[in-house]
Amino acid sequence: MVMSGIIGDNFFIPSLFILSMFLAFFFRKRIVRKILFLEFDENVKNLAPRDFFYSILKMEKSIKSFYLAEILFLLADILFILFGGYAMYLERLELSKKYSYLLISPASFVLDHLTLPIILWVIMFFLLLLTLFMIKKEKKRVSDMLNYLNKYNILNSAKTDFFNSDKIIKSEVILQSDIKLGDKYLFSIYTAYILPYSWIKDVKIEKVHGRGGSGGFYYLNFTLNKSFNPVRIFFAKKETAEQVKKFLLKKAFY
């Protein structure tokens, strides 16, 4: 009866789904903040510049909370479906024996109550596949970026700048981590960027509109004097984007 009562509550699995996503975002934010405020092991601090930046910028680090949340939800949901569904089936079978006038078969009744958990399991499974794909793709992008920066012999000074800087700007956008503005470089953990100010040719503020043309967020669209990957830094507030743009252009040209 307890299990069937839980299954009958249509809010249990959706609530678990929402909670797992909330915790993933919460812990990802914590991980990023620790990196920006240099709260990591001495072993990491003592790595060579390229290894150091790869260690803190690799997607596995910032997205690990999502990966774990997705796996835990999939396990919890499948156990819920298998064991809870079986318990509910047995209970419904007993009722159908006592009350022969019940028109819905036990299997159909259970399937009807488990439709939402099954749909959420499928959604989370595809999110997990997407996460694994993004990790693989981002790993290559970060590695290529660091190799490109290393060609210009700037990773040593970038590491020094990263440790000496304490200017943290909040993006307040889910898909963009807070950024660190050093004396010579911009640092973003997610999406991973190390951008020398001297490479900036121009910065424009663009807007991504929300549904119905209202809301949305802003991003800095960079024009660079090097053949670097496109760089976009997102912010929830236009005022923040304008302040960062002004700071970057000042550093780039003065």
Locations of regions flagged by a protein language model:
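Phosphoinositide-binding peripheral membrane targeting modules
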Residues: 176-210
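Acidic, Ser/Thr- and proline-rich intrinsically disordered linker/docking segments
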Residues: 204-254
